[in-house]
Amino acid sequence: MTYLEIEGTNHLSGNVTISGAKNAALPLIVSSILAKNEVKINNVPNVADIKTLISLLENLGAKVNFQNNSALLNTNTLNQTIAKYDIVRKMRASILTLGPLLARFGHCEVSLPGGCAIGQRPIDLHLLALEKMGANIQIKQGYVVASGNLKGNEILFDKITVTGSENIIMAAALAKGKTKLLNVAKEPEVVQLCEVLKDAGLEIKGIGTDELEIYGSDGELLEFKEFSVIPDRIEAGTYLCAGAITNSKITLDKVNATHLSAVLAKLHQMGFETLIAEDSITLLPAKEIKPVEIMTSEYPGFPTDMQAQFMALALKANGTSIIDERLFENRFMHVSELLRMGADIKLNGHIATIVGGKELNAADVMATDLRASSALILAALAAKGTSKVHRIYHLDRGYENLEEKFKGLGVKITRLEE
């Protein structure tokens, strides 16, 4: 197994270039199922989740050429409508193939994502919406088996769901008639999907709001144009926290500050200043790192994917911080590992109380998921001594060239084999 060895540091400096957003690239790659032409997507991050999705599309018969952060996708060769478990189990986002496959072919089978219990994660919202559009859906031996010709309808999502919104937007693109979606996710990644589909000829109104009207093409495939994936706001937020936890001056390049409003607001509350240019953000050191109160919520609120990183940062604050995780259960699995480094954190349900200002010590820690693993790296930067972070395959799912980017900021970080 591979692990990272990270030496605690007092200071970072330099520039880091932000990659394309994994969570935007995934649905955009899947949307090529709706295309009549070859689709070229630029600024695609070279991370494990992208490779998994490309493997899935190739397994369905698509021809994909992925190099130098550009993906060339031809789905005219699709000859399979079964998304198999051995690939889908690696990544929940594979469920995104359900809507477009059903819309294009009138039938498909998609394995339930690994460990995904219906009702706990909102995949049930995907299925209910497709049923409202006329799909016949059954769960058979761990697969969603769907069939039917989709027709537009009015659909209200009971809860805001990013992947659910994306799935149904893609399904509605080829459906017959108008689909009205209410309580749609407004994340930048959802907005870009809508804009790309609009550029491909889809009539869609309300982009960027929680109400969309989509006028389906009744089975006619779309003519895609070449486009680039938006910058990764979570990667950007993670590097901002790396600069903050070491109280350093660093600059992020190729970043969209508008997508980071909630993160920047909390950094400002903690005493940090930022200089924002057209596509860069410079973080300036704080005179004093202040405690903060954070409640996660849907965009444009504070992102749940930044909660773990800010928990690590709060350990350096002079006082007590509160983090209220409102979106997901089991999102505090990094706490037990931070405690091994000397953190003072108490949990009460979905609320974490973090007492900052205590010295962190290096330790061997284990990553439990993608964002938790980045929190452990941040804590290791601020700890005294050399830490080892195990199970870093979680990091490889979502962070491109992580060691090289940290080394460019002056971090002593090494990938080693056990």
Swiss-Prot record:
GO cellular component, one term: cytoplasm
Xref: InterPro entries: Enolpyruvate_Tfrase_dom, Enolpyruvate_Tfrase_sf, MurA_subfamily, RNA3'P_cycl/enolpyr_Trfase_a/b, UDP_GlcNAc_COvinyl_MurA
Highest taxon of source: Bacteria
A GO BP annotation: cell wall organization
Sequence positions that bind UDP-N-acetyl-alpha-D-glucosamine: R92, R121, P122, I123, D124, L125, D305, L327
Modified residues (2-(S-cysteinyl)pyruvic acid O-phosphothioketal): C116
Active site per UniProt: C116 (proton donor)
This protein's record includes keyword Repeat: no
Reactions that this protein is recorded to catalyse: phosphoenolpyruvate + UDP-N-acetyl-alpha-D-glucosamine = UDP-N-acetyl-3-O-(1-carboxyvinyl)-alpha-D-glucosamine + phosphate
EC assignment: 2.5.1.7
Alphabetic keyword roster: Cell cycle, Cell division, Cell shape, Cell wall biogenesis/degradation, Cytoplasm, Peptidoglycan synthesis, Pyruvate, Transferase
Positions contributing to phosphoenolpyruvate binding: K22, N23
Pathway entry: Cell wall biogenesis; peptidoglycan biosynthesis
NCBIfam families, alphabetized: murA, PRK09369.1
Family: Belongs to the EPSP synthase family. MurA subfamily.
Name of this chain's protein: UDP-N-acetylglucosamine 1-carboxyvinyltransferase
Native organism taxonomy: Bacteria, Pseudomonadati, Campylobacterota, Epsilonproteobacteria, Campylobacterales
Gene name for this UniProt entry: murA
